[in-house]
């Protein structure tokens, strides 16, 4: 009976993935056609999405990222993210996935190792090639400095959002897709040059953190006593340190 249930579950997962692929492919084809027929209108629509996100990195213009939408590499990267979201096990009010992470010295830990008593633990998932994540690091650092007396903070370095050999953006950091833990460590050390105000750890090469927390391309969480008390929306639109601030204000 158990093996039958596993088989059914596996079949349902394949069906889910097939449906995601179909609708995403359709979305890309339609987007590509609209970009060709109405380039100015589509540019305005895409720009408005970024304005809504509240991220205005002066280093990035539409020409750096707009033309990369609805390409094959766009399709492949978004498909990977959407398929990985099927593994999401992180829900508000439920137990936080105790996934493995690696510190910068190469030692293996788990998320719960960073929980301290009743203190909230803020998790920030991201990578250097995700412009909004890097752009808002200063804002995140302010959070750390303001609330470090009542909460702990941890940055988890995950797979590159816009690797140079994948869905790359112009005028962005040149970091290739991680093929080994050493690659990911090198990328995290690049992040350290930006002086984050809290510890940085790495997702393992199995990308279990990214999967169980549906973290790609960037995301914020707050854990407390082993449970999730805040789950931010998926970045870049949903990466909002100000929401974390509001939650922590109530904990003072």
UniProtKB/Swiss-Prot annotation:
Residue ranges, Extracellular side: 1-17
SUPFAM superfamilies referenced in this protein's UniProt entry, alphabetically: Thioredoxin-like
Active site: 130
Localization, UniProt: Cell membrane; Endoplasmic reticulum membrane; Basolateral cell membrane
InterPro entries according to UniProt: Iodothyronine_deiodinase, Iodothyronine_deiodinase_AS, Thioredoxin-like_sf
Membrane-spanning segments: 18-38
Chemical reaction(s) catalysed: 3,3',5-triiodo-L-thyronine + iodide + A + H(+) = L-thyroxine + AH2; 3,3',5'-triiodo-L-thyronine + iodide + A + H(+) = L-thyroxine + AH2; 3,3'-diiodo-L-thyronine + iodide + A + H(+) = 3,3',5'-triiodo-L-thyronine + AH2; 3,3'-diiodo-L-thyronine + iodide + A + H(+) = 3,3',5-triiodo-L-thyronine + AH2
Membrane-topology descriptor: Single-pass type III membrane protein
Major subcellular location class: membrane
Activity regulation info: Lacks sensitivity to 6-n-propylthiouracil.
A GO biological-process term: thyroid hormone metabolic process
Stretches in topological domain Cytoplasmic: 39-252
Entry keywords, A to Z: Cell membrane, Endoplasmic reticulum, Membrane, Oxidoreductase, Selenocysteine, Thyroid hormones biosynthesis, Transmembrane, Transmembrane helix
GO molecular function: thyroxine 5'-deiodinase activity; thyroxine 5-deiodinase activity
GO cellular component: basolateral plasma membrane; endoplasmic reticulum membrane
Superkingdom of the organism of origin: Eukaryota
Function: Plays a crucial role in the metabolism of thyroid hormones (TH) and has specific roles in TH activation and inactivation by deiodination. Catalyzes the deiodination of L-thyroxine (T4) to 3,5,3'-triiodothyronine (T3) and 3,3',5'-triiodothyronine (rT3) to 3,3'-diiodothyronine (3,3'-T2) via outer-ring deiodination (ORD). Catalyzes the deiodiantion of T4 to rT3 and T3 to 3,3'-T2 via inner-ring deiodination (IRD). Catalyzes the deiodination of 3',5'-diiodothyronine (3',5'-T2) to 3'-monoiodothyronine (3'-T1) via ORD.
Family from the record: Belongs to the iodothyronine deiodinase family.
Subunit structure: Predominantly monomer. Can form homodimers but homodimerization is not essential for enzyme activity.
Name of the molecule in the record: Type I iodothyronine deiodinase
Organism, scientific name: Xenopus laevis
Gene name in the database record: dio1
């Amino acid at each position: 009976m158990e093996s039958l249930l596993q088989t059914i579950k596996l079949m349902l997962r394949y069906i889910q993935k097939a449906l995601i692929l179909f609708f995403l492919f359709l979305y890309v084809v339609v987007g590509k056609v609209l970009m060709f027929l109405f380039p100015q209108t589509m540019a305005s629509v895409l720009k408005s999405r970024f304005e809504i996100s509240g991220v205005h990195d002066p280093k990035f213009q539409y020409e750096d990222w707009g033309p990369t939408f609805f390409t094959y590499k766009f399709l492949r990267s978004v498909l990977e993210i959407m398929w990985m979201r099927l593994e999401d096990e992180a829900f508000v009010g439920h137990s936080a996935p105790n996934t493995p992470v690696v510190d910068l010295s190469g030692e293996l830990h788990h998320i719960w190792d960073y929980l301290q008593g009743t203190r909230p633990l803020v998790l920030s998932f991201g990578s250097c090639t995700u412009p909004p994540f890097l752009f808002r690091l200063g804002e995140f650092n302010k959070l750390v400095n303001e609330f470090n007396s009542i909460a702990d903070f941890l940055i988890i370095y995950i797979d590159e959002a816009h690797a140079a050999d994948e869905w790359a953006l112009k005028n962005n950091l040149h970091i290739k897709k991680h093929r080994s833990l050493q690659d990911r460590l090198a990328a995290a050390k690049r992040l350290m040059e930006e002086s984050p105000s809290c510890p940085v750890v790495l997702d393992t090469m199995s990308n279990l953190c990214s999967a169980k927390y549906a973290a790609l391309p960037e995301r914020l969480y707050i854990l407390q006593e082993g449970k999730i008390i805040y789950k931010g929306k998926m970045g870049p639109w949903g990466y909002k340190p100000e929401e974390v601030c509001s939650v922590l204000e109530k904990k003072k």
